[in-house]
A protein has these predicted regions:
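N-terminal Rossmann-like NAD(P)+-binding domain of SDR-like oxidoreductases, especially those catalyzing
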Residues: 1-184, 309, 317, 323-330
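Residues in well-ordered alpha-helical elements
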Residues: 69-72, 91, 98, 109, ...
Length: 330
């Protein structure tokens, strides 16, 4: 049997690199080769791929998903695309949204076009979207059929790319599968996001900035469980379908902060309440019945254990995050 040649965009980032390390690691499918296409923005980190760099099944192409000619050339040699590349930080999209629209919308459309028009035939396209496309929900959980009501420029750019991806299925018959996951956590997470920011601040004895009263609720998904869900959809999902992927642990930011204070042996003295994020969604909650029933998805990582492991990883890998924090002035 020949290997499936998978093109992973954004594979030098947090989730994409974990996906690549897993695919090429001992628990991977074994019958794949992986090419990462990544622009190496501030969030892309070559060190995230150190574990696989010498693997003969791995290759890396530096470049922008908006570069039509490059994308067509790279896509030509692949059988599947798994698309993570994006501008991903909500706060940055509030400061300036242009890059979000360019990369997340135009970049996705460039890839879809290359997937559709590939010499030798179209290739399946797994689009990694987010639960933020649904907006905010006070009670209950969103099934995949709920309308999209994104609030931040980031979420709106992801909703746009999500819909453009599905349009390539409905219009052209391209095999497009969309996943909408909740908030990921784990190692190698860029230290501007809440969990790694709080852990690294606490490790340094600094205060952590909690938005407003910390009442915003998020569902937390460990990266191992996210990869499990993505692989189920890549290998067994149906073309044209959307699959929610959640972790099953809903916490307010205040509850999350409490757990991180405990892990670091700190108190609420270390917390600074800061002005709330503009347009801050109150609660996200995805209904994962579809992926559970159709593909047998089961999140396995206990949140308390996963958070402790994540805390320990940052404690033990200062050399990974310290330069990133200094460079980004976090
Ligand atoms: P990240 O910011 O850590 O990584 C993004 C990667 O994309 C980086 O390696 C960056 O260099 C690359 N990139 C950015 N612009 C590019 C371009 N124009 N061309 C090529 N590469 C480019 O993001 P992440 O947290 O790993 O998220 C991955 C995907 O998952 C994103 O699509 C994001 O919207 C989605 N997602 C993330 C979360 C989460 O909790 N982190 C939750 C839901 C959905």
């Amino acid at each position: 049997m020949t290997d499936t040649r998978i093109l992973v965009t954004g594979g030098a980032g947090f989730i994409g690199s974990h996906y690549v390390r897993t695919l090429l690691g001992p628990d991977g499918p074994g019958d794949v080769t992986v090419t990462v296409l990544d622009k190496l923005t501030y969030a892309g980190n070559p060190a995230n791929l150190d574990d696989v760099r010498s693997n003969p099944r791995f290759s890396f192409v530096p470049g922008d998903i908006c570069d039509r000619e490059l994308v067509a050339r790279v896509v030509a040699g692949h059988d599947q695309i798994v698309h993570f590349a994006a501008e991903s930080h909500v706060d940055r999209s509030i400061q300036g949204a242009a890059e979000f629209i360019t990369t997340n919308v135009l970049g996705t459309q460039t890839l879809l076009d290359a997937a559709l028009r590939r010499p030798g035939g179209p290739v399946p396209f797994l689009h990694v979207s987010t639960d933020e496309v649904y907006g905010s929900i006070d009670e209950g959980s969103w099934p995949e059929t709920d309308p999209l009501r994104p609030n931040s420029p980031y979420a709106a750019s992801k909703a746009s790319s999500d819909l453009v991806a599905l349009s390539y299925h409905r219009t052209h018959g391209l095999d497009v599968r969309v996943t909408r996951c909740s908030n990921n956590y784990g190692h190698h997470h860029f230290p501007e996001k809440v969990i790694p920011l709080f852990i690294t601040n606490l490790l340094d004895g600094h205060k952590v900035p909690l938005y407003g009263e910390g009442l915003n609720v998020r569902d937390w998904l460990h990266i191992d469980d996210h990869v499990q869900g993505l692989e189920l959809v890549r290998t067994g999902g149906r073309p044209g379908e959307v699959y929610n992927i959640g972790g099953g642990t809903e916490l307010s930011n205040k509850e999350l902060t409490e757990l991180l204070l405990e892990l670091s042996g700190s108190t609420w003295q270390s917390v600074e309440h800061v002005a709330d994020r503009l347009g801050h969604d109150l609660r996200y909650s995805v209904d994962c019945t579809k992926i559970r029933e159709e593909l047998g998805y089961r999140p396995r990582k206990d949140f308390t254990q996963g958070l402790r492991e994540t805390f320990d990883w940052y404690r033990d890998n200062r050399a990974w995050w310290e330069p990133l924090k200094n460079r980004a002035a976090l």
